[in-house]
């Protein structure tokens, strides 16, 4: 096993101005995970519990990120009861939150108008009691449990077609490893829109659990 850092990002479609260039990612705090297994460019990761700020946005995959980011960025940049700034973390994450589709359904089955969950992981050291309360009632704080996640990392564009291609590959990997998919796929972006496409860090993650052998 080896340790690494990363944000779950339950997505994202982003983003107005993260302030992250190609070389800035590692300077930003990320949520913590341990790599349990690695096969080629696939990883099985165990994420530690954490707190996220989340907002639900209704719309198409390619459109919801900007709105979600604006709400969450407003919160961490002082739109809260303490008027307190909170350090930026990475990545921003996005996943389906549609009530019409089972949790194991792929994003490719989502329809326009579905709900998407956009999240920022909160920096280590905060608790639910010490984080400032959001002024925007569309932003809520939630405790995220630790999770086992299958992951694939890639560079390139943020288009839906490429995301679905990587998601499909990750599902094949999970099946080959005897893993049961237990939640929605998550799209994580680590860079600002102005970062050159070939320097971007993108990830698709899927919650999984090991299948008990009879």
Task: Label every model-predicted segment.
Residues 2-214:
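A solvent-exposed interaction/effector surface
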């Amino acid at each position: 096993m080896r340790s690494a850092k990363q944000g779950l990002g339950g997505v994202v479609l982003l983003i107005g101005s993260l302030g992250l260039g190609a070389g800035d990612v590692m300077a930003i705090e990320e949520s913590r995970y341990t790599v349990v297994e690695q096969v080629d460019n696939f990883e099985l990761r165990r994420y530690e519990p954490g707190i996220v700020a989340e907002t639900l946005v209704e719309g198409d995959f390619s459109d919801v990120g900007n709105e979600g980011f604006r709400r969450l960025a407003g919160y961490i940049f002082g739109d809260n009861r303490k008027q307190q700034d909170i350090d930026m973390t990475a990545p921003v994450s996005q996943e389906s939150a549609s009530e019409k589709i089972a949790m194991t359904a792929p994003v490719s089955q989502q329809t326009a108008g579905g709900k998407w969950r956009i999240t920022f992981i909160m920096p280590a050291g905060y608790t639910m009691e010490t984080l400032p309360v959001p002024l925007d009632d569309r932003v809520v704080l939630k405790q995220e449990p630790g999770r086992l996640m299958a992951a694939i990392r890639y560079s390139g564009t943020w288009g839906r077609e490429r995301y679905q291609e990587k998601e499909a590959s990750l599902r094949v990997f999970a099946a080959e490893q005897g893993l049961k998919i237990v939640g929605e796929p998550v799209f994580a972006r680590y860079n600002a829109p102005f970062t050159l496409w070939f320097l971007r860090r993108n990830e698709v993650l899927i919650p999984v659990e090991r299948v008990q052998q009879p």
